Amino acid sequence: MNLLEKTRKINAMLQKAAGRPVNFKEMAETLCDVIEANVFVVSRRGKLLGFAIKQSIENERMKRMLEERQFPEEYTRNLFNITETSPNIDINSEYTAFPVENRDLFKTGLTTIVPINGGGERLGTLILSRLDREFDNDDLILAEYGATVVGMEILREKAEEIEEEARSKAVVQMAISSLSYSELEAIEHIFEELDGTEGLLVASKIADRVGITRSVIVNALRKLESAGVIESRSLGMKGTYIKVLNDKFLTELEKLKSN
């Protein structure tokens, strides 16, 4: 395959993913195929987002690292010293992707490191490694193209997380604002009693202790449940099982209590 055909292969993978998130493993496998090298997509914290192996490396530490999907902390930290593509790093470098304890076995091992940037910050690193053959300009063009795609995907995921967090918070705030003063008071006592995200409570006991009617507690729980903030299930004489579904709820409730 020439450079154009290899680029088209990456594009075909992206078009196939149209409308859905790009799978980092799939991206690594495509790059592995067109560049003919081991490929590792590493997050800024060293998490292995995706990888593909062209040349198997028989080393227990490497096997464990791939199983745990986590690069060593020190190695990950050192990667931030590399701010532009660094091709053909040899086995004696601290940046080699080959196991240094087996230098004799991997004398011809070469590593290329490509920073993954986006939104003005470092998002991760694309690491390529292979034996015997140097990475040429075509390989580097493909690697940098791949790193750009991965960077865009990481940014998209981050934006979705921020959007989801904002949506969850808004739902909680609307649910809490729908409660009357006595219902809010009841909810505060309920979750003081639960002391966690799920548990069992007897509504009548709380009603007697706080001095409110049982119907106030039932109405408050019903409002939160209809908003999707909690789920509740009556267990008859045992009481009511309650579980928090929205992780922003307890935080927002705590804020109200401290104001």
Swiss-Prot record:
Residues annotated to bind DNA: 203-222
Gene: codY
Cellular location(s): Cytoplasm
UniProt keyword Repressor present: yes
Family to which the UniProt record says this protein belongs: Belongs to the CodY family.
Function description: DNA-binding global transcriptional regulator which is involved in the adaptive response to starvation and acts by directly or indirectly controlling the expression of numerous genes in response to nutrient availability. During rapid exponential growth, CodY is highly active and represses genes whose products allow adaptation to nutrient depletion.
Phosphoserine modifications at: S215
Keywords carried by this UniProt record: Cytoplasm, DNA-binding, Phosphoprotein, Repressor, Transcription, Transcription regulation
Pfam families the UniProt entry points to: CodY, HTH_CodY
Species this protein is from: Geobacillus thermodenitrificans (strain NG80-2)
Top-level taxon of origin: Bacteria
GO molecular function terms noted in the UniProt entry: DNA binding; DNA-binding transcription factor activity; GTP binding
GAF domain: region residues: 1-155
Name of protein: Global transcriptional regulator CodY
Key word Cell membrane present: no
Recorded GO CC terms: cytoplasm
GO terms for biological process, alphabetical: negative regulation of DNA-templated transcription
